[in-house]
Amino acid sequence: MTNKNETGWNLESSYTVLPKSFFTEIPPTPVHSPELIKLNNSLAISLGFNPEELKKDAEIAILAGNTIPEGAHPLAQAYAGHQFGHFNVLGDGRALLIGEQITPSGERFDIQLKGSGPTPYSRRGDGRAALGPMLREYIISEAMYALDIPTTRSLAVVSTGEPIYRETKLPGAILTRVASSHIRVGTFQYAAARGSIEDLKALADYTIKRHYPEVESTENPYVALLQEVIKRQASLIAKWQLVGFIHGVMNTDNITISGETIDYGPCAFMDSYNQGTVFSSIDTQGRYAYGNQPYMAAWDLARLAESLIPILHEDEEEALKIAQDEISKFSVQYENNWFLGIKKKLGLFSNEEHDQSLIEKLLKAMEKYKADYTNTFRALTDNILENAPLFKSPEFKEWYELWQSRLERQKESKDDAYKLMKNNNPVIIPRNHRVEEALEAAVKDGDYSVMEKLLQALANPYEYSQEQADYCTPPVPSNRPYRTFCGT
């Protein structure tokens, strides 16, 4: 046990109020010789922890799953999911929710140990995780947070001192993941598949109380819950698209009810603009390609709506109609969010009839000339149009004149327009080749300085600094396309 007054542990376990079918209580499997690799000091402080205390051996033992803090009730959550379109009953196969940290401001966050050992849901897996993928999740999740995209976060990475075996022998690690909750679309699918309306209602009531208390007093809280989840996901997916983020594995078990991005396994950021961009080695059909993400989110949310049908209305036909009506609103909400965001990226405050055409012309030219997505928008922001093929093209020159004329017709000044662009066009993203470079140095050489420099550069993505310059260059074109794997 720890002294929570010194370290800051302030755990509750409200998830255990749900029926026992939703989880299995099980302790983490201890590891041989845990070592703290990375601690997120600023996140620790916001959660109410003393970072210096967390660096002590007794606390590292908690982050490794070797000891249990006061107030913890370790459990593996059960859920289901459509994985690449195929339904499976799943669950936390290598992660344990140890409790919910109540912050000094009264907020509640799940504290989950990822890689903490086997559970009843492990499906023949060893329940462990490798150091490289855990560091990768740390880097990407914190970059997403800095980009102002709702996301789970990473509190710490601890090496276990034990090897794990995949294609080769790899160093083991445990990630401490922080989330508003780990309730997923797949959690509702799991409840619906079991056929108990009481259990489904219990999950919905718990979710409303935890995430959407404002809908408790509405005429139909379950319809309102569906509406709120759709609204948050429409906002989230638009934010992904606007920075060129490709999740890679948008299965229903990776769609959170809170609207946070979760699971950074095969994700990556787009370099040259292409709607068909795919990085995941297992997405051979391009199901989760960049341009498909809004459609797949709608598909996933339709699975949530299906799961809720038994409690949306007592008449099944009416419930089905409600579900269909609500899901049909996603595309409009997404388009509105994306359109507003892309206009900000171009410094547009007002609406004009031909704005959609203006935006489409730029994106079409970017795709034709394989323009770097992030750097193109930043070049427009900084008004430094250098020797990229796009900027020399007749299509771009024509578009640029139209855009400048459009800016001049606004009542806001061009200076205001460029300020708006600066706040919406990042200088830096976690470039895939730079992330791999940092991971290789860390895992192969035990050199964490490359990762630290990358994290520092990613911390303020909208503010240019000299330290960021080296991280803004796209990868050199190669015959081997970049591929990601489900290591996390």
From Swiss-Prot:
Mg(2+) binds at residues 254, 263. It catalyses: L-seryl-[protein] + ATP = 3-O-(5'-adenylyl)-L-seryl-[protein] + diphosphate; L-threonyl-[protein] + ATP = 3-O-(5'-adenylyl)-L-threonyl-[protein] + diphosphate; L-tyrosyl-[protein] + ATP = O-(5'-adenylyl)-L-tyrosyl-[protein] + diphosphate; L-histidyl-[protein] + UTP = N(tele)-(5'-uridylyl)-L-histidyl-[protein] + diphosphate. ATP binds at residues 91, 93-94, 114, 126-127, 177, 184, 263. Keywords: ATP-binding, Magnesium, Manganese, Metal-binding, Nucleotide-binding, Nucleotidyltransferase, Transferase. It is an enzyme of class 2 (transferase). Pfam families: SelO. GO terms for molecular function: AMPylase activity; ATP binding; magnesium ion binding. The keyword Nucleotidyltransferase applies. Belongs to the SELO family. NCBIfam families: PRK00029.1. Nucleotidyltransferase involved in the post-translational modification of proteins. It can catalyze the addition of adenosine monophosphate (AMP) or uridine monophosphate (UMP) to a protein, resulting in modifications known as AMPylation and UMPylation. This is Protein nucleotidyltransferase YdiU. The gene is ydiU.
